[in-house]
Amino acid sequence: MSRAIMLAAAAATDLDPAPISPDWILSGTPETRSKELARSHDRTSYVMVWECTAGRFNWHYNKDETLVVISGAAVLTYEKGGERRIGPGDIVFFPAGTTCAWHVPEYIRKVAFLRHTMPYPFGFAVLAWNKLLRIVGWWATSPLLLALFLRH
């Protein structure tokens, strides 16, 4: 199966309307748009560009999200208190299951890296499986080790 490398200009990507749930809006009329740029082969991770106009809203994260601000700014208020202004170049990580209040004074555009989480035992099993495949793959490329392995 062929896998392609994806390149995009996040600042210039055309986006599609992606409204915020009306229940999440605290004030203003924020308009959001987004576009998925790429998705992993196993469908558990993807990259998207997202932008929002002025407003205040809560965002409930149902998957892990890491974002990089491309342009504009926002003020984030965390569930446990604390407030932080973010702007171009800032990186933020939101674990699945958290909520954050956003105040976008004018506009913000970000690139988001989203990942569906899985229970620890499943994640550990996937890591172990991948390691086993790497070991077997390494053996398969070494004629000496392959011969020794097949001999027994």
Model-predicted regions and their roles:
Residues 1-44, 147-152:
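A short, N-terminal "cap"/entry segment at the start of jelly-roll beta-barrel domains
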Residues 52, 61-76:
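Short, conserved beta-strand element in jelly-roll/cupin
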